[in-house]
Swiss-Prot record:
EC number in record: 1.7.2.1
Gene Ontology biological process: denitrification pathway; nitrate assimilation
Occurrences of domain Plastocyanin-like (ranges): 25-193, 194-363
Main subcellular localisation: periplasm
Record note on domains: The type I copper site in NIR plays a crucial role for electron transfer from pseudoazurin to the type II copper site of NIR, which comprises the catalytic center of NIR for the reduction of nitrite.
Cofactors: Cu(2+); Cu(+); FAD
Name of the protein this chain belongs to: Copper-containing nitrite reductase
Length: 363
């Protein structure tokens, strides 16, 4: 930990020098575009294929520390979030664009924060140039020089794991300028895109085995850290709470639509699986320069990664998207539903005989 603090401290000092140079580089003279972020599972409107020169794409994110209810039993988490959601918003740009982020830490917060973009080069992914205390904001610009889906997360000195598992993570998608392609170079199109942010949570219990509730972040730290060190999460959830993407909040689609799922896990490995469907095309490392894998039943997310999977729905019904660590999915909460409308195709599946009395075969 002391090594990380020393490196981050040096980067902060270097950051003061770098910022004085304005980090102009190749961004001077490019068109500047402001984008309003939206809360997951939705993703802000964007083009899949672009022409013309790169742009400077401007985003603004505000850090919010708040208490969140994470299950139907009323269990609470003293959360730290980007823009108030867990995960934070998904940012989308194209390869060659410049991302210009204004990161705001309101005076109502109690902690220092920053952001490490796994897509960025230098200064600990930007963490060394973005540390802000309550009442400050900072502007970071970096070039999106490689395509793919990437994690971003908070990484303050000495507190990285706590901030990450308390909600401060999200995804950035850098699309190829000519769009997503299959291994033969054919354009792949999506009709909808959803972000699924998987979080492992570590809620302390009291001596009677009940989850504890804390009045503020500071009072939760030591107990939470003790649970974190067991490496045993109390909850594993999609988008901030058990059931966040089920029932009335289920994702939606229609037969014939292609849906891109961006699934991020900033801390632990995961194994996504779509019950009743597949991954038609899966970028298992989340990097679009690598050819996607075809017809996947279950794919893998290394901790600290975001993965993209594309599927065209062929049958109506309610699908379940989950981590195929079934204990974590069914017992701890890591599952979502997708409700799909359309006409049933008997050629793909049919019930030949309805349930009824057992008929013994004739001899």
């Amino acid at each position: 930990m002391s090594v990380f603090r020393s490196v981050l401290g040096a980067c902060v000092l270097l950051g003061s020098c770098a910022s004085s140079l304005a980090l102009a580089g190749g961004a001077e003279g490019l068109q500047r575009v402001k984008v309003d972020l939206v809360a997951p599972p939705l993703v802000h409107p964007h083009e899949q294929v672009v022409s013309g020169p790169p742009k400077v794409v401007q985003f603004r994110m505000s850090i919010e520390e708040k208490k969140m209810v994470i299950d139907d039993q009323g269990t609470t988490l003293q959360a730290m979030t980007f823009n108030g959601s867990m995960p934070g918003p998904t940012l989308v740009v194209h390869e060659g664009d410049y991302i210009e982020l204004t990161l705001v830490n309101p005076a109502t917060n109690s902690m220092p924060h920053n952001v490490d973009f796994h897509a960025a080069t230098g200064a600990l992914g930007g963490a060394g140039l973005t540390q802000v205390v309550p009442g400050q904001e900072v502007v970071l610009r970096f070039k999106a020089d490689r395509s793919g889906t990437f994690v971003y997360h908070c990484a303050p000195q000495g507190m990285v794991p706590w901030h990450v598992v308390s909600g401060m993570n999200g995804a950035l998608m850098v699309l190829p300028r000519d769009g997503l392609r299959d291994p033969q170079g054919k354009l792949l199109h999506y009709d909808r895109v959803y972000t699924i942010g998987e979080s492992d949570l570590y809620i302390p219990k009291d001596k009677d085995g009940h989850y504890k509730d804390y009045p503020d972040l500071a009072s939760s730290y030591q107990d939470t850290r003790a649970v974190m060190r067991t490496l045993t999460p109390s909850h594993v959830v999609f988008n901030g709470r058990v059931g966040a993407l089920t029932g009335a909040n289920a994702l939606t689609s229609k037969v014939g639509e292609s849906v891109l799922f961006i699934h991020s896990q900033a801390n632990r490995d995961s194994r996504p699986h779509l019950i009743g469907g597949h991954g038609d095309w899966v970028w298992t490392t989340g990097k679009f320069a690598n050819p996607p894998q075809r017809n996947m039943e279950t794919w893998f997310i290394p901790g600290g990664s975001a993965v993209a999977a594309l599927y065209t729905f062929k049958q109506p019904g309610t699908y379940v998207y989950l981590s195929h660590n079934l204990i974590e999915a069914m017992e701890l909460g890591a599952l979502a539903q997708i409700k799909v409308e359309g006409q049933w195709d008997d050629d793909l599946m049919t019930q030949v005989k309805a349930p009824g009395p057992i008929v013994e075969p004739k001899q």
